């Protein structure tokens, strides 16, 4: 297993929103956390990214509690693209993407040849090379999203967390992003993402984790998980399930 959550409770101030959650994320898969708004998908992802400390329980990676790892060690293992970004003023696109290499820099902070190659590769993957000298703050929302994705790719971590990564992206860019997730998996990485589009989740993801009110309702492959009964129970949706003619995965049409 890539990441294991054991008896985890999470909360903000004195309010618990996740109680006694236990969950295993399979290695080398594209995994989607899905569920209605407020079901704690992003909260769970933040805990795995070490942005939210558990009230109780543990999260382990490679058998070691993630809070026992140094920030640099964990940043070499895990890259996280949050749902919302703080866009720094006065920084150019290529500079921001190069920040993805920060966990690997020496005391002098100089990029190695490998670092520079990974930055160039990440820009090519996200089609941001033509934006390299522009200020990030001057870009559109969709362009900024691609730049932050490039920074995440440049980090070259084996575990990649993407919180609602299709935000601000048009349909063409969304399809490209989904293709990149598949490519990362084929290159040996584990991708965990929060998605709202159920048809996208079924077409592009190997493993689905369905959440409701901070609890896991079901998990498995799209064919194992996505039933008309579950969609009614979790999302209050009345649907007809067909087969996607492209991927042969479940596809949903509202009644």
Predicted regions and their residues:
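Conserved ABC ATPase signature
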Residues: 110, 135-139
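Conserved ABC transporter NBD signature motif
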Residues: 57-65, 73-74
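Helix-to-loop junction immediately C-terminal to a conserved catalytic motif
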Residues: 49
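Catalytic Walker B motif of ABC-type/P-loop ATPase nucleotide-binding domains
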Residues: 160-164
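The feature captures the beta-strand-to-loop junction immediately N-terminal to the Walker
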Residues: 34-36
